[in-house]
Regions:
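Acceptor/aglycone-binding surface of glycosyltransferases and processive sugar-polymer synthases
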Residues: 72-90, 95, 107-189, 216-226, ...
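Acidic helix N-cap motif at the loop->helix transition within catalytic regions
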Residues: 20-24, 51-60
Length: 242
């Protein structure tokens, strides 16, 4: 039934050069789900990382079992939006979590998300950096401005009703995510935003949880100059088509 909470959660984890982060993310995820008694699987969608991410994923598959860790790689870097679509094909959970492998998201929040979902029987639970105690640590001013600017622009143009659209950490009811993916046209980071905009149009319910977003434990921030340009382009396209 629609009122059912998360019985099994599928985590879609797109990776590109995340060799150092992956074992820690997987360990934290596994521990969090086990502590909260939620059945889970982690689907690793690696886009042909040259750094040995896939070899690490194979080791993790051996350690945790292939029912818990599913490596479903692609030949080359094809972008976030299509990574989630690819991962969905293999997901068996009734709820889906989409997140980055770079530990920007407090993994322990999965438990909170599941609780929040049950509390309001939401279709989607999204983390927000700009509500209550969801502060942003370790972000330089430029990133803060870009992130706030992106959010502000999106809110002005599209009024989507979720205060942090770019925070790519969400829990979706599986059939809701499938429906949204059919409707989404964007690639890359814009994809995350479009999902929420479309969700609102289709009348799905969104619960929000404040996230204290600790900027990437290892590795450089992934939002490069050309990402930002394509983000803005995507935003305009989205504005034109909604």
């Amino acid at each position: 039934t629609a009122a059912m909470g998360p019985a099994r959660v599928s985590v879609l984890l797109p990776t590109y050069n995340e060799r150092d982060n992956l074992p820690l993310v997987v360990w934290l995820l596994a521990r969090t789900f086990r502590d909260s008694g939620i059945d889970f699987e982690i689907i690793i969608i690696d886009d042909g990382s040259p750094d040995g991410t896939q070899e690490v994923a194979q080791q993790l598959e051996k350690i945790y079992g292939s029912d818990k860790i599913l490596l479903r790689p692609r030949a080359r870097k094809l972008g976030l939006g299509t990574a989630y679509i690819h991962g969905m094909k293999y997901a068996t959970g009734n709820f889906i979590v989409i997140m980055d492998a770079d530990l920007s998201h407090h993994v322990r929040l999965h438990f909170v998300y599941c609780g929040k979902q049950k509390e309001g029987n939401f279709d989607i639970v999204s983390g927000t950096r700009y509500k209550g105690n969801g502060g942003v640590y370790g972000w330089d001013l430029k990133r803060k401005l870009i992130s706030r600017g992106a959010n502000f622009l999106t809110q002005v143009l599209l009024r989507p009703g979720a205060s942090d659209l770019t925070g790519s950490f969400r829990l979706y009811r599986k059939e809701v995510l499938q429906k949204l993916m059919e409707k989404c046209v964007s690639k890359g980071y814009v994809f995350q935003m479009e999902m929420i905009v479309r969700a609102r149009q289709l009348g799905y319910t969104i619960g929000e949880v404040p996230i204290s977003f600790v900027d990437r434990v290892y590795g450089e921030s992934k939002l490069g100059g050309n990402e930002i340009v394509s983000f803005l382009k995507g935003l305009l396209t989205l504005f034109a088509t909604t």
